[in-house]
Amino acid sequence: METWFLYFITKSISYALFMVLIVTFLESLALVGLFLPGIVLMSILGTLIGNGTLSFYPAWIVGIIGCMCGDWISYYCGFKFKKCITNLHLLKNNNVVLDKITNTLTNYPITTILLGRFIGPTRPLVPMVCGMLNISLKTFIIPNILGCILWPPIYFLPGIFTGIAISNTTNYSENTYFKIQFLAAILLIWLGIFLLWKLWKRYTDTGKKKIYISNVNLCLLLTISLSAGITIMIYIQSNSTLIFFRKILWKILISSQ
């Protein structure tokens, strides 16, 4: 699938923008998004931005439109066809996920609508469940729009860096020490974010679960991983390779029209 997708989008910029619209729309569409490898497809599109084939801002705007269309249609479907949706075989097999989304939406609607967009399994479900719960448009629309604005560039980012790296291999291929530091910083920061999410889930999940690590130790690991990752990231800011990457990234953002 990814090979065919890459072949299609490299044929024309118009095709690429059309695929940004389709991918972001289907990723956000109720239930359909569960079956798409969103991070893979968005990273491929981000690679085209990184190597200069596709402009950043048009792709971002098209991505926002696709996200909003998918979310708002999902919200309408949840509101209009609640009874039909609850009888779907797919949802009956995923009652645990649906119940968790329902509980968090009931207690933390704005936070769940915003953060739910960035979590793969919940992205195509949260707007639909909002409609099913009759959550008001006033509550739904602001965090939804904010999530739709932030989601495309965040998911483009891995591909953008990959595109820059592929197009400029001679500028960093020998700097192995920098690559190890950079990778370690990214992994530690992502670990910290993951632990923060796990800690948040513990405080919001009312069900009883086996706890293999105490909250104190979890907070300690969270603090250490984030502190170490941020410290390494600050330390390598003066590295010539990172300076080069920043210049290329800035050029992509400034020159895009």
Curated annotation (Swiss-Prot):
What kind of membrane protein is this, topologically?
A: Multi-pass membrane protein
Does the entry feature the keyword Transport, yes or no? no
Which residue ranges does UniProt annotate as crossing the membrane?
5-25, 29-49, 53-73, 146-166, 180-200, 216-236
* Principal localisation: membrane
Keyword entries, A-Z: Cell membrane, Membrane, Transmembrane, Transmembrane helix
The record's subcellular location field reads: Cell membrane
Q: Name one Pfam family in it.
A: VTT_dom
An example GO CC term for this entry is: plasma membrane
Keyword presence, Acetylation: no
State what protein this is by name: Uncharacterized membrane protein bbp_130
Give the organism the record lists: Buchnera aphidicola subsp. Baizongia pistaciae (strain Bp)
